[in-house]
């Protein structure tokens, strides 16, 4: 079905509309061979709190951004190549329901749909796009993924020393290897994590010792594949730290997601 939409006027019109909603702050999305597979609002677990984000699934990339004016204007556009993506379903945990992890080599985070049905639809469509993309390119799935970050609100004290309380002076920091919230002294070391950056990144003391030991022992296991539980509701990346600028805040009217490649909508 996706292949039938490649050269359709409806597909080009939809992609152009997405471009217009992001304005000059966004990148060009209308390129040969690209299809808009689906779109909708998901709740993204950001560093400080859960926030509504508009997501657009294309056959080769996943795009999301802040909602400034519902269905009319978005900003802070993020593009994720689907060939780098791996999904991991999350179990329901209290108020956090219908969620899954979106994991890549440079950034990993949790998102939540409004219903179980929408979760299944999103995951099925994303996985189908990933499978088709990898099959056509002949590439293998990425095996190394960035750690998801524990939200600031989940830690009132350092997760490493278990002593330091976070205040205006004692700031929170995140270990780039395991995602834990730690204090400054417990994250004073840096280590190269090639999948995330070409510069040494802040890591906690435990991860630093483990990574250094692996390097010394000649272990080829790649850094970044932490062993956090699948029910984690964390977010990685610093790009969300200043996301509170959005106009709509959390007052976003929910509409069911639209998927154009399943034949149910007008082509």
PLM feature segments, named:
Residues 1-170, 174-180, 184-188, 201, ...:
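Membrane- and cytoskeleton-facing regulatory interfaces of eukaryotic small-GTPase pathways
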Residues 197:
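Flexible phosphate/Mg2+-sensing switch loops adjacent to catalytic phosphate-binding sites
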